[in-house]
């Protein structure tokens, strides 16, 4: 093997060059190691990160999967840490069930988990618009916890019809490299990840979320429910809609009642020139001849 070929096997700069050029990562002046630049905590997150996975580097792993690995000698691969990530997926169907699940996850377990609204149109949860995830480090651990959570869901007054199952890795990785039961870690991948692990620095998020973020989060959940036709959100607004319904106008039919105040329908008499009360009437003036 030539010296040049040997250099190509560890040419980290070429692997990450598009991300450097786009400003997604920067090369630190003190030691030339790489830092991700776009990992700030969102101020309007869809998820309640109840307890985070210790040592989780998810923003980096997604960049590694999508942008870096295809440029390495190993080709596109699922990061080895992600192959060890087993998730219990819980599918609440309404905002009422989501709040009940949140309370259950906060009070009954100490497992790493999150729950919230599913905005990704391609995700399996999008059918129900809400979801919960419990993170596990092995299939064995995941299956043991799945049995426990299913039992608790079945015995819960609100969550007794909610589905739960076990999956491997992130949805995006399952889509990019289908059939997670066939994922493996090659020797080339190990070499690439060993090199990158040394060069990348991480700001791992702390567990939990502060009160001001949770306040906005719960408002976002309720607004999402209202926007997606989930009327159980009315239980959190004293039965009042968040968004005022439009006033509807229909021609008055002889012998019928006016529209219900609930749907704000106004019956208008067909008499020419009549304008309903509260509606401004526009008049057109003729210009005087000079």
Functional labels for PLM-detected ranges:
Residues 154-175:
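Conserved short beta-strand edge segments in small beta-sheet-based binding/regulatory domains
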Residues 1-103, 114-121, 182-185, 193-271:
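Charge-rich, low-complexity segments
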Residues 102-105, 144-157:
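Short amphipathic alpha-helices in soluble, non-transmembrane regions
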Residues 110-111:
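Catalytic-core elements of nucleic-acid end-processing and repair enzymes
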Residues 282-289:
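Arg/Lys-rich low-complexity patches in intrinsically disordered regions that function as generic
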Residues 94-95, 135-143:
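Helix N-cap motif at beta-to-alpha junctions
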Residues 122-138:
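Histidine-centered divalent-metal-coordination microenvironment in nucleic-acid enzymes
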């Amino acid at each position: 093997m030539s010296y040049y070929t040997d250099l190509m096997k560890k040419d980290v700069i070429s692997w990450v060059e598009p991300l450097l050029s786009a400003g997604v990562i920067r090369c630190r002046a003190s030691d030339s190691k790489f830092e991700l630049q776009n990992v700030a905590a969102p101020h309007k997150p869809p998820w309640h990160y109840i307890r985070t996975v210790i040592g989780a580097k998810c923003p980096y792993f997604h960049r590694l999967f999508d942008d870096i690995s295809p440029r390495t000698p190993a080709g596109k691969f699922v990061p080895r840490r992600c192959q060890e990530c087993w998730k219990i997926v819980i599918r609440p169907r309404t905002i009422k069930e989501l709040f009940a699940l949140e309370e259950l996850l906060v009070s009954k377990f100490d497992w790493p988990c999150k729950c919230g609204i599913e905005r990704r149109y391609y995700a399996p949860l999008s059918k129900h618009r809400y979801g919960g995830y419990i993170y596990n480090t092995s299939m064995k651990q995941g299956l043991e916890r799945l049995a426990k959570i299913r039992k608790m869901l079945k015995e819960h007054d609100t969550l007794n019809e909610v589905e739960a199952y076990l999956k491997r890795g992130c949805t995006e990785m399952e889509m990019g490299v289908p059939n997670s039961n066939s994922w493996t870690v090659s020797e080339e991948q190990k070499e690439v990840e060993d090199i990158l692990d040394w060069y990348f620095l991480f700001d791992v998020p702390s567990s939990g979320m502060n009160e001001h973020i949770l306040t906005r989060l719960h408002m976002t959940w309720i607004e999402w429910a209202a926007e997606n036709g989930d009327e159980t959100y009315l239980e959190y607004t004293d039965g009042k809609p968040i968004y005022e319904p439009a006033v509807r106008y229909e021609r008055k039919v002889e012998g019928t009642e006016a529209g219900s105040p609930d749907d704000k329908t106004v019956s208008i008499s067909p008499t020419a020139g009549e304008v309903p009360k509260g509606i401004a009437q526009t008049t057109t003036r003729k210009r005087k001849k000079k």
